[in-house]
Design a protein with these regions (language model features):
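Alpha-helix capping/helix-boundary segments
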Residues: 23, 58, 97, 117, ...
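Active-site neighborhoods of divalent-metal-dependent phosphate/nucleic-acid chemistry enzymes
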Residues: 2-11, 39, 88-130
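Short acidic, glycine/proline-enriched helix-loop-strand junctions
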Residues: 78-100, 106-107, 113, 137-151
Length: 151
């Protein structure tokens, strides 16, 4: 079974997934190593039965490079592209998420941005978290799907 078919099968088994910033970065950069996976994920996001979430922290991470390079067009392109997926919820930090992130950080030793991503996934009731960072495997509240393992 090919990478795309295997990943599509995995996605269908989860009622809601959460996405780390790396998924968006690889897609927007058209990273050749991960493009089959990210294309599958973003195609899946267009299906009516899909449901996904990410923290607005993701947008912060994505926009650093275009702002650093003073590329207003790329900022607009990112904002336009990323806000158009119908089944992707952009979840801002709340006091509840901040509290959960602090607990995750204390228990699992994650850095604050990662703890916020994990807390957002838990708060959004995601059953899987797609990333390329092994640190998320410390958290048992969801299945961590590493893009490197989906090659």
């Amino acid at each position: 079974m090919g990478v795309a078919r295997r990943l599509a099968s995995i996605l269908r088994r989860h009622r809601r997934i959460a996405l780390d910033a790396s998924v968006f970065i690889y897609q927007l950069e058209a990273n050749p190593k991960y493009l089959p996976q990210t294309k599958t994920i973003f195609s899946w996001l267009e299906l009516p039965e899909s449901s996904a979430a990410t923290s607005t922290i993701t947008m912060t991470e994505l926009l650093v490079m275009p702002y650093r390079e003073r590329d207003a067009q790329l900022v607009d392109d990112f904002n336009g592209l990323l806000s158009t997926y119908p089944n992707l919820d952009w979840i801002p930090p709340s006091l509840e998420i901040a509290d959960l992130a602090a607990r995750i950080r204390a228990l699992h030793g994650l850095k604050t941005p990662d703890a916020l991503q994990a807390a957002t996934a838990v708060n959004a009731q995601a059953t899987a978290f797609i990333t390329n960072d092994k640190v998320f495997e410390r958290i048992n509240a969801f299945d961590t799907l590493l893009l490197d393992r989906l090659l």
